[in-house]
Amino acid sequence: MSNLYVQMQNGWTAKNIESLRPYFTDALFTQMERSLQGYAQRGETNVVERIAVLDVTPLGFHQTGGEDQILPRLRTRITDYTVNDGTQQIVRGSRDQEKFMTYEWDLLRPTGMQTNAESGETKRITCPGCGAPLDVNASARCPYCGTVIQQQAQDWVISAIRGIKQQTL
């Protein structure tokens, strides 16, 4: 989860989270993409730097409605600011002030699925639109033809990220 958090923040700054699609539900991925599109429409970039995951604590495991659910809490440290793409001037936040964030994530997978360490986190399939090979967990966008492929999640996906606490130093 620590690695995924860092990848997510780096993708956010790069305004490209497509490589993270297999790790999110379609609803959460779409919500995050819309947020990034809002920054792009305003001509802004939300920059996240000095990323560190300080702690990951499992809070619980549940089975409901045919799904397994894991609830971890992540404590992180970042710097977070927004720049105008044209002028590179900071419009919100600070390059210097560190934010200590606490999040709770919801991770889901179908009950009965088992994580196979040898096969990794995704499944290799063929794009129905153009025949290209794709690695998919819950969904993926073909980089060749743009087709979005959805299937039942084969492994854990993040369905929600809740900000619990924020402290700026």
What spans do the regions from the language model cover?
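Core segments of small alpha/beta cavity-forming domains
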Residues: M1-I51, G129, P143-V148
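Short, well-ordered helical secondary-structure segments
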Residues: G11, T45, L59, R92-S94, ...
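Surface-exposed, charged secondary-structure patches
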Residues: Q41-G86
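Long, contiguous hydrophobic alpha-helical segments, chiefly transmembrane helices and signal peptides
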Residues: M1-W12, Y23-F24, P72-T76, M101-L107, ...
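Generic detector of short, locally flexible boundary/turn motifs and exposed helical patches
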Residues: P22, R34-Q41, D68-L74, G93-S94, ...
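Amphipathic, alpha-helical segments enriched in basic
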Residues: Q7, V47, T82, A117-G120
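Short beta-strand edge/turn micro-motifs at domain boundaries
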Residues: Q69-L71, D85-L169
